[in-house]
Curated annotation (Swiss-Prot):
Record key words, sorted: Cytoplasm, Disulfide bond, Heme, Iron, Metal-binding, Mitochondrion, Oxidoreductase
Main location, first listed in the record: cytoplasm
Role description: Monomeric globin with a bis-histidyl six-coordinate heme-iron atom through which it can bind dioxygen, carbon monoxide and nitric oxide. Could help transport oxygen and increase its availability to the metabolically active neuronal tissues, though its low quantity in tissues as well as its high affinity for dioxygen, which may limit its oxygen-releasing ability, argue against it. The ferrous/deoxygenated form exhibits a nitrite reductase activity and it could produce nitric oxide which in turn inhibits cellular respiration in response to hypoxia.
Gene Ontology MF terms: GDP-dissociation inhibitor activity; heme binding; metal ion binding; nitrite reductase activity; oxygen binding; oxygen carrier activity
One GO location term (cellular component): cytosol
Subcellular location(s) of the protein: Cytoplasm, Cytosol; Mitochondrion matrix
Entries under PANTHER family matching the protein: BLR2807 PROTEIN (PTHR46458), NEUROGLOBIN (PTHR46458:SF19)
Entry similarity comment: Belongs to the globin family.
BP term (GO), one: response to hypoxia
Catalytic activity line of the entry: Fe(III)-heme b-[protein] + nitric oxide + H2O = Fe(II)-heme b-[protein] + nitrite + 2 H(+)
Organism lineage string: Eukaryota, Metazoa, Chordata, Craniata, Vertebrata
PROSITE patterns associated with the record: GLOBIN (PS01033)
Protein name, per record: Neuroglobin
Protein residues bound to heme b: 64, 96
Species for this entry: Macaca mulatta (Rhesus macaque)
């Protein structure tokens, strides 16, 4: 896999990182629209959410969105040396596997990430920017998937 174009990633992330919760909510709303079976995996204090809107307005889930956006921020910060995040990302993979997330769902997360970036950036979300983010996300998922394979 080619290395992502660092400057395209950083430049586009600057716009997103100004409002991470807002943009992260767009990402997860899209994720639940594409893969509604993921909604039951999100439970806090034994509370089952009745709808994506219910989940997306929950303070506990908003905290999860913040954490996801911090992981993306770490990947952007380390875009030229993602190996420095290898152990952390593999451990995230293990955690996601333990709660029942399927590895195949990360493809839908990637689609949702690209959707959010396109909505945030508008015309600045060029084909080159899309390709750079696809490469970065692919590398992150590759590292996380190692968590599925290890105990």
């Amino acid at each position: 896999m080619e290395r992502p174009e660092p400057e395209l990633i950083r430049q586009s992330w600057r716009a997103v990182s100004r409002s991470p919760l807002e943009h992260g909510t767009v990402l997860f709303a899209r994720l639940f629209a594409l893969e509604p079976d993921l909604l039951p995996l999100f439970q806090y204090n034994c509370r089952q959410f009745s709808s994506p809107e219910d989940c997306l307005s929950s303070p506990e889930f908003l905290d999860h969105i913040r954490k996801v956006m911090l992981v993306i921020d770490a990947a952007v910060t380390n875009v030229e040396d993602l190996s420095s995040l290898e152990e952390y990302l593999a451990s995230l993979g293990r955690k996601h596997r333990a709660v029942g997330v399927k590895l195949s769902s990360f493809s839908t997360v990637g689609e949702s990430l690209l959707y959010m970036l396109e909505k945030c950036l508008g015309p600045a979300f060029t084909p080159a920017t899309r390709a750079a983010w696809s490469q970065l996300y692919g590398a992150v998922v590759q590292a996380m998937s190692r968590g599925w394979d290890s105990e």
